[in-house]
Amino acid sequence: MMAYMNPGPHYSVNALALSGPSVDLMHPAVSYPSAPRKQRRERTTFTRSQLEELEALFAKTQYPDVYAREEVALKINLPESRVQVWFKNRRAKCRQQRQQQKQQQQPPGAQAKARPAKRKAGTSPRSSTDVCPDPLGISDSYSPPLPGPSGSPTTAVATVSIWSPASESPLPEAQRAGLVASGPSLTSAPYAMTYAPASAFCSSPSAYGSPSSYFSGLDPYLSPMVPPLGGPALSPLSGPSVGPSLTQSPTSLSGQSYGTYSPVDSLEFKDPTGTWKFTYNPMDPLDYKDQSAWKFQIL
């Protein structure tokens, strides 16, 4: 009977052993038992005597070293790891109690200020006290140019926006007022341009026939092309006779008549002695008036 219950060794079939390590004797539908699930550690329940020992050590130090923990663990008959976890939880509980006491001592208004609501950037405008003053004196608002006292165009500086590509004035208000007050003196300078109305430039083709109306805005920069016929003769080397003085007013320059002229009349080629007066010595060998004075150097 026992021989029937305990079969003999397996015989090989076609030289293959059925009990080898590579032979699966179980049906594939039958699964193997899985590894046992790790059970959760049980909660430790401390007795009154254990808590008294732990609280006594916690009153001495909140961070005991490993030797102090092992000593207490031997007294209360607990592993050292449980004592370490108890101290960790006790420190967290102590911090929580301190925060609650601070919140109870503070008034309700102080609690709201201690933890303000987080606002998004750019939602609320800045107050006037937060805005830094502009060191250059440039304001964000545009102001038109101030008129001068005599009605003439002045060099008043207009403040523009800081984002404008136009030129900005780095001058303070005091210097700006000084520039406005000295407007007439600036307009009398030879480089101040008087702007003519647009109708004087492009109203009709007849406007181009009058040089005074066409060049009225450029008179301070342009000297008259041709002096009057009765004026003094031009000399290429004489400074004062080149043209009228720059100190003349634009109205006097624009009022001059530009007549037709001939290079022969203006430069007076007919009389070379009166026009082409070179500052040369009469005995100079380059004097062309006396051909007998011509001298040639032999090379």
From Swiss-Prot:
Described function: Transcription factor that binds and transactivates the sequence 5'-TAATC[CA]-3' which is found upstream of several photoreceptor-specific genes, including the opsin genes. Acts synergistically with other transcription factors, such as NRL, RORB and RAX, to regulate photoreceptor cell-specific gene transcription. Essential for the maintenance of mammalian photoreceptors.
GO biological process: cell differentiation; nervous system development; positive regulation of transcription by RNA polymerase II; regulation of DNA-templated transcription; regulation of transcription by RNA polymerase II; visual perception
Assembly mode: Interacts (via the homeobox) with NRL (via the leucine-zipper domain). Interacts with PDC, RAX2, RORB and SCA7.
DNA-binding region residue numbers: 39-98
Domain of life: Eukaryota
Expression by tissue: Retina.
Keyword Transcription recorded: yes
Similarity comment: family membership: Belongs to the paired homeobox family.
A GO term for molecular function: DNA-binding transcription activator activity
Protein name: Cone-rod homeobox protein
Gene, per the UniProt record: CRX
Location within or outside the cell: Nucleus
Keywords: Activator, Developmental protein, Differentiation, DNA-binding, Homeobox, Neurogenesis, Nucleus, Sensory transduction, Transcription, Transcription regulation, Vision
